[in-house]
Amino acid sequence: MNDFKGKTVIVTGGASGIGKSIAESFAKKEANVVIADIDELKGKKLEEHLNQTRMNSLFIKTDVKNETEIKELITKSFEAFGAIDILINNAGISKFHSFFDLTVEMWEEVINTNLRSVFLCSREAAKLMKQGSCIINLSSTRAVMSENGTEAYSASKGGIAAITHAMASSLAEKGIRVNCISPGWIETGDYESLREVDHKQHFSNRVGKPGDIARTCLFLAHPENDFITGENITVDGGMTRKMIYEE
């Protein structure tokens, strides 16, 4: 039985990288897939590719920093497919700056793209969602570990993890589950160019791939897993559990 056939899934930042893999995975399950992205060229290309096999995908150009465009995204998605069953808040940017050079404008660009968009997309989608729907947010292991110059990014991802359990509480009465995924190193570029040392620093002995996150989304969105809500699942090949000492 295909539990996703005919379900409507919105994937923000769905035109490339992890988001593209998520969109493709749900399309293979015969879901109605809405690709929301600021990149019109890549978005339309993916829409065309997915619709070569079945007419169930729709690209909607969306700047997730813009509240009006988010409202239009949700409205158009509902008008096109008559329901919103799954929302995957994947859109995000990872711009790192020196702590002392980080301006308010730089800070707000990252926070508004990564964190505020999760709130706005979820608020608007939840208004139209029915019992049994779900929201999946993409955080990061950088919410709990850091490098220099990642203040805005880490704050945004930490906020996503926190707002996940807050929304899980607020939306429980509507029967909407809310969960979070924290990816580690997910290579969206040239996987073959990675070094052995890159793979060996993971317990899994390999760097992650976009499909690892897509499969986690399928798991969390599956109706049989309706006892899971308010959770943040780390998918990082065990990297954040590895104890490291200087040698």
Where do the language-model regions lie?
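Substrate-binding pocket helix/loop in short-chain dehydrogenase/reductase
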Residues: 98-99, 106-111, 198
